[in-house]
Structures are given as structure tokens and as C-alpha cells.
């Protein structure tokens, strides 16, 4: 799985077992993180009671390779703490949460903690004291970033996979979205108490972002809509129709205040990305409008786009081409491929991942399978009537 995001001035790109921290302005690599093939060599402890021999077998061994197990370590999520002092990442294969101390040249590993299940999203607390990890069964755990030996704390649970998680700046609410169309606002630390729901989406909610300076958030969904909510009341403030289902969302604040650029990645559409400028009506605290919108082709169809990062002038798009990681840059202004970024530099970056295959995620499984029981019943009833009529005709003859 590939992940990319922009935390000024760094562009962070993670894939396979590597994370690169890039400066897109001077085309330098700040630092990198490379995980070992077997995380037990850096402190991962196998959970007590684990009975699967393959889980205990070192990933780098010949036996594991020959068996073709799915225990190859690969990075799933990467996140910077708000104070920029910590880096957290989660892995698949050997499921773990790794916490690093961010330093100018090298990141120092602080802890490696086993995860019970594969992670789906990751978010730091606003004060950087802890990190939230959600898994594919819908559970959300809190891991302490100060007391590194403290056990994880189960905070809340969904009945389906959680795709994104936010922690409000005042740390009073944790906001989650899932495959079952829901956006849930949970009180913190009393997470047994649900404050509100933001309901209205008809398909999975793939991404959330807080609109700074307000009590509002924006969401993107597989139902082809972009929506703005008051998360305290659960009231919908804006609904904008998209040309295709949205599977990724990024947000960037603009000047003047309370103007934001929202970017979404579309699923299986001729245009890969959509850019939308959100503006709050000066006469009202609840009225949002789409002031500007633009579609970016990004050569959709010629390669498999998996994620992107949004900067002031550019869109960095990562994906797979012939099972190799590919990175391309487009202008935010016109959607054309950027000519200011040397192709050689992009090739140099992706060459660092040359030993890692890049297989795109199958996003079709995000959509819920719907069954029309009435149609099936009517079809069976029709066949019974036809069979009965045939039997009557045979008896008469």
C-alpha cells in the first residue's frame, strides 16, 4: 500500500518497507526510514497464545518465502504528530505500530507495539501525547506516546471498517467514518457516550477533514457527494454532487480565512481528481458554497492511481505502472503536468522503491453488495406459475 501527504515543508512518501521525507522545493531528501524484513529484530513481540507457525516464522527466512505467506512487512499508514516531534506508522503482514522520534537527519525508533488486527487509519492527538489506531473490524485503540509501555486502551467500536478518524483541536470529540455510510462524533474521554451522528451518505464515507476555525467538517463518499456538516449538531450544511465516487480526500486552508481547497480522488473515472474551493458565507456561519471547481485528468486510465498530496501549487500523485511505484506532479492551477519538477528527480525518488512491487488496492470491495430479494422472489414465483401451467396442459392432453 502507498501513502503520501504534505506536512510543510516535507513531502512524505511511504511504500513497502520504506518512508522518504522529501523537500519538493530544493529537491532534497531530508531523511528516510527503512523497516527490517522481520520486525521481531527491532523489538516486535509475538502476542501470547499465537498458534500460527507462519506468524512466528521470521519473514526473511527461506521457509516463509517458499511458503508464499502474506507476512511480508509493508507500511499501511504514516502520520506526523502536530508538534512534528514524532512519526507513527502501522504495518501489515507483521501487524505493528512503530513510533519514531523525528530528528533533522535520522528518525530514532522509540517503540514497536503489536496490533491485534490490520490497521485502517491513524491519527495523533492534538497535543501529540497519544495516537489513535483503527482496525478493519471497526475498533479504535489509543496508544500512549509518553508511557510507551502502557497497554493500548480500547476507546470505541464500529460494526464495519473505519476509513478515517479525526480528533478535534479541543480534544473533546473523536470523529470517525465507516463503510456503513456513517459519520460518528464520540465524546472524549467518555467514549461510551456518542455525541452526534452526521447521517445522509448512501455509500461508504472515505475521508474527513476539519474546517479550521469552525465547528464544521467536510466529508467525501462513494455515493458521489461532497458534504459539509456541523459535527456538534449533526446538521448537513452543504451537499455537492461529484462526477464519480470519491475514495480519497485532502484539504488545504486558503487565505483569507474560512476558505479551503478540497481535493478528492475519484474511483474509476476519466478524470482522476477534483479540486473544489469551499467558502463560508460572511453573512452566515452555516452557509458554505463551492466558489470554484476544477477536474484534473492526471492521465487516468494509463496507470493505477492510489493516493495524492496537495501543496500550494502542485498535486503529487502516486500510483502503480507495471507493478512499479510511479510519482507524477500536476499544477493545481490548470491540472497540467508540472514542468518545474525535473523528471530525473521523480525517477530518483521512485528508484528508491525499485525493490518493492506496487500492486494497487482493490477498491471495489469498499462498495456494499446489495441484494434485491423482491426481484428474486418474483422471478421464482413466475417460474412456479409457468411450471404449474405446463403441468395442467400435460394433464389435459
From Swiss-Prot:
Disulfide cysteine pairs (residue numbers): none
Pfam family, any one: WD40
WD repeats: 70-110, 114-153, 157-196, 200-239, 300-340
Keywords of this entry: Cytoplasm, Developmental protein, Differentiation, Nucleus, Oogenesis, Repeat, Spermatogenesis, tRNA processing, WD repeat
Entry keyword Nucleus: yes
Keyword field contains tRNA processing: yes
GO BP term, pick one: oogenesis
PROSITE patterns tied to this protein: WD_REPEATS_2, WD_REPEATS_REGION
Tissue: In testis, it is present at high level in hub cells, a niche for germline stem cells of testis. Ubiquitously expressed in all testicular cells throughout spermatogenesis. Ubiquitously expressed in all germline and somatic cells of the ovary.
Protein's cellular compartments: Nucleus; Cytoplasm
Protein function: Required for the Mettl1-dependent formation of N(7)-methylguanine at position 46 (m7G46) in tRNA. In the Mettl1-wuho methyltransferase complex, it is required to stabilize and induce conformational changes of the catalytic subunit. Required for binding of nanos mRNA and repression of translation by the mei-P26-bgcn-bam-sxl complex. May cooperate with mei-P26 and nanos to derepress the BMP signaling pathway. May cooperate with mei-P26 to suppress expression of a subset of microRNAs. May cooperate with mei-P26 to regulate bam expression levels in germline cells during gametogenesis.
Additional free-text comment from the UniProt record: Wuho means 'no progeny' in Chinese.
Similarity annotation: Belongs to the WD repeat TRM82 family.
Name assigned to this protein: tRNA (guanine-N(7)-)-methyltransferase non-catalytic subunit wuho
Organism: Drosophila virilis
Gene expressing this chain: wuho
Amino acid at each position: 500500500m502507498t501513502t503520501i501527504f504534505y506536512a510543510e515543508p516535507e513531502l512524505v512518501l511511504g511504500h513497502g518497507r520504506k518512508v522518504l521525507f522529501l523537500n519538493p522545493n530544493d529537491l532534497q531528501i531530508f531523511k528516510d526510514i527503512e523497516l527490517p524484513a522481520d520486525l521481531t529484530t527491532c523489538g516486535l513481540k509475538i502476542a501470547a497464545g499465537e498458534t500460527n507457525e507462519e506468524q512466528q516464522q521470521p519473514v526473511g527466512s527461506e521457509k516463509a518465502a517458499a511458503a508464499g505467506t502474506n507476512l511480508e512487512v509493508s507500511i499501511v499508514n504514516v502520520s506526523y504528530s502536530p508538534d512534528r516531534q514524532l512519526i507513527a506508522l502501522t504495518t501489515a503482514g507483521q501487524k505493528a505500530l512503530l513510533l519514531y522520534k523525528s530528528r533533522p537527519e535520522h528518525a530514532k525508533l522509540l517503540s514497536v507495539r503489536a496490533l491485534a488486527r490490520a490497521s485502517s487509519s491513524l491519527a495523533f492527538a492534538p497535543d501529540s501525547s497519544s495516537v489513535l489506531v483503527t482496525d478493519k473490524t471497526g475498533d479504535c485503540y489509543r496508544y500512549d506516546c509518553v508511557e510507551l509501555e502502557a497497554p493500548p486502551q480500547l476507546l470505541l467500536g464500529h460494526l464495519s471498517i473505519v476509513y478515517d478518524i479525526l480528533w478535534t483541536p479541543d480534544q473533546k470529540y473523536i470523529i470517525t467514518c465507516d463503510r456503513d455510510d456513517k459519520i460518528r462524533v464520540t465524546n472524549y474521554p467518555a467514549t461510551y457516550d456518542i455525541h452526534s451522528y452526521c447521517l445522509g451518505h448512501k455509500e461508504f464515507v472515505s475521508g474527513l477533514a476539519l474546517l479550521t476555525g469552525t465547528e464544521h467538517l467536510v466529508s467525501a463518499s462513494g455515493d458521489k457527494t461532497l458534504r459539509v456538516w456541523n459535527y456538534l449538531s449533526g446538521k448537513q450544511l452543504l451537499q455537492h454532487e461529484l462526477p464519480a465516487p470519491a475514495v480519497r480526500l485532502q484539504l488545504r486552508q486558503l487565505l483569507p480565512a474560512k476558505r479551503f481547497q478540497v481535493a478528492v480522488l475519484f474511483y474509476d473515472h476519466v478524470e482522476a481528481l477534483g479540486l473544489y474551493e469551499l467558502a463560508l458565507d460572511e453573512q452566515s456561519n452555516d452557509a458554505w458554497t463551492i466558489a470554484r471547481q476544477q477536474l484534473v485528468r492526471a492521465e487516468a486510465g494509463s496507470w493505477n492511481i492510489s493516493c495524492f498530496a496537495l501543496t500550494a501549487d502542485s498535486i503529487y500523485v502516486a500510483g502503480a505502472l507495471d507493478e512499479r511505484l510511479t510519482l507524477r506532479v500536476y499544477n493545481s492551477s490548470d491540472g497540467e503536468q508540472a514542468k518545474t519538477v525535473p523528471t530525473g528527480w521523480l525517477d530518483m525518488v521512485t528508484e528508491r522503491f525499485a525493490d518493492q512491487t506496487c500492486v494497487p488496492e482493490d477498491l471495489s470491495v469498499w462498495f456494499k453488495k446489495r441484494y434485491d430479494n423482491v426481484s428474486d422472489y418474483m422471478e421464482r414465483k413466475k417460474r412456479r406459475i409457468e411450471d404449474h401451467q405446463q403441468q395442467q396442459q400435460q394433464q389435459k392432453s
